[in-house]
C-alpha cells in the first residue's frame, strides 16, 4: 500500500468522523493494513493527522498553482473557483478544508506543529487571493483579501457543522458581492 493511499483514506475518515473520533485503529481497518505495521510509520493518531493534513495541504497548493497557470480563466473566475471546488466536495460528501479549521480548534496552541500547518494553509490562501486582487488592481487588495478569506473561513466553519451546499452557495454569492463592490470602488463608482 502506498503512503498516499493511506493518507487519502485517513483524510476521508477524518472528514467523516472528525479529528476527535478518528483513531489509528480505524485507519488501519479502513486500509486493511496491520495496525503494528502502520505504527512503524505513524506511531500515534497525532502523527497520522499531521501527515494527512500536510498531504492535503500539498494537494491544495498544487490545485492553486494549476489554477494560477490556467490562462483560460479570468482573475475573477480564479478567485471564485474555490467555491466550485467546495461544491464538488459537498456533492462527493468530502469536507477537506474544514479539517484545517477543526485542527486549530483541537490544537489551539499556535506553537503546535498541526496548528502551524493549518496557519500556513490559511496564509497561503490569503496570498493566493491577494495576488489575484492585486492583478485586478482593486483598491486596497489587502483589505479585500481579508474580507474574502473571512467569507471562505466562515463557509468552511459552517460546512464543518452543517455540511450544506446552501452555505457554499451563500458564501459564493457573498464573495461575488465583495469582488463586485471592490471593482466598483476601483472604477470610482463609490467615491
From Swiss-Prot:
InterPro entries: Homeodomain-like_sf, HTH_TetR, Tet_transcr_reg_TetR-rel_C_sf. The keyword rRNA processing does not apply. Keywords: DNA-binding, Transcription, Transcription regulation. GO terms for molecular function: DNA binding. Residues 1-60 form the HTH tetR-type domain. It comes from the Bacteria. The keyword Transcription applies. GO terms for biological process: negative regulation of DNA-templated transcription. Coiled coil: none annotated. NCBIfam families: PRK11640.1, TF_DicD_YjdC. PANTHER family: HTH-TYPE TRANSCRIPTIONAL REGULATOR YJDC, TRANSCRIPTIONAL REGULATORY PROTEIN. This is HTH-type transcriptional regulator YjdC. It comes from Escherichia coli (strain K12). The lineage of its organism: Bacteria, Pseudomonadati, Pseudomonadota, Gammaproteobacteria, Enterobacterales. The gene is yjdC.
Amino acid at each position: 500500500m502506498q503512503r498516499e493511499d493511506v493518507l487519502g483514506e485517513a483524510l476521508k475518515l477524518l472528514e467523516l468522523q472528525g479529528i476527535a473520533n478518528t483513531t489509528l485503529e480505524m485507519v488501519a481497518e479502513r486500509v486493511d493494513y496491520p495496525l503494528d505495521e502502520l505504527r512503524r510509520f505513524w506511531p500515534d493518531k497525532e502523527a497520522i493527522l499531521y501527515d494527512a493534513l500536510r498531504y492535503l495541504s500539498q494537494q491544495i497548493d498544487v490545485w492553486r498553482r494549476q489554477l494560477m497557470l490556467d490562462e483560460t480563466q479570468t482573475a475573477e473566475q480564479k478567485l471564485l473557483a474555490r467555491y466550485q471546488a467546495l461544491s464538488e466536495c459537498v456533492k462527493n460528501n468530502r469536507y477537506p478544508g474544514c479539517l484545517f479549521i477543526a485542527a486549530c480548534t483541537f490544537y489551539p496552541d499556535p506553537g503546535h506543529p498541526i496548528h502551524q500547518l493549518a496557519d500556513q494553509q490559511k496564509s497561503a490562501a490569503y496570498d493566493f487571493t491577494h495576488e489575484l486582487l492585486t492583478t485586478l488592481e482593486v483598491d486596497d487588495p489587502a483589505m479585500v483579501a481579508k474580507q474574502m478569506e473571512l467569507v471562505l473561513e466562515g463557509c468552511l466553519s459552517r460546512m464543518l457543522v452543517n455540511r450544506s451546499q446552501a452555505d457554499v452557495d451563500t458564501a459564493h454569492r457573498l464573495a461575488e458581492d465583495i469582488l463586485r463592490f471592490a471593482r466598483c470602488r476601483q472604477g470610482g463608482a463609490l467615491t
